[in-house]
Amino acid sequence: MTRRIICQKLGKEADALNYSPYPGELGERIYNHISEQAWQAWLSHQTMLINEYRLSLIDPKARQFLEQEMINFLFGIGSEKPAGYTSEKE
């Protein structure tokens, strides 16, 4: 049976993640409070940020930026799209 949680991002009951997707205390917080659906939304948003800002994941500043954006997206005020960004669907 799938574990269910009240997702902090979605504000409703949803399927939980099967494993902690991030190391440390933050990963534990994500595992306990963020749904699979919200995590997938973050992964899509993260991909857009990496591409639009041309981030290199070997750069510690880029990783720090993405971690802060992840916290904002999942738990806080949200993460803004880059200025001038338009999706292919628009």
From Swiss-Prot:
It comes from the Bacteria. One of its GO terms (cellular component) is cytosol. GO terms for molecular function: iron ion binding. One of its GO terms (biological process) is cellular response to oxidative stress. SUPFAM superfamilies: YggX-like (SSF111148). Keywords: Iron. It holds the Pfam family Iron_traffic. HAMAP family: Fe_traffic_YggX. Could be a mediator in iron transactions between iron acquisition and iron-requiring processes, such as synthesis and/or repair of Fe-S clusters in biosynthetic enzymes. Belongs to the Fe(2+)-trafficking protein family. NCBIfam families: PRK05408.1 (NF003817). This is Probable Fe(2+)-trafficking protein. It comes from Coxiella burnetii (strain RSA 331 / Henzerling II).
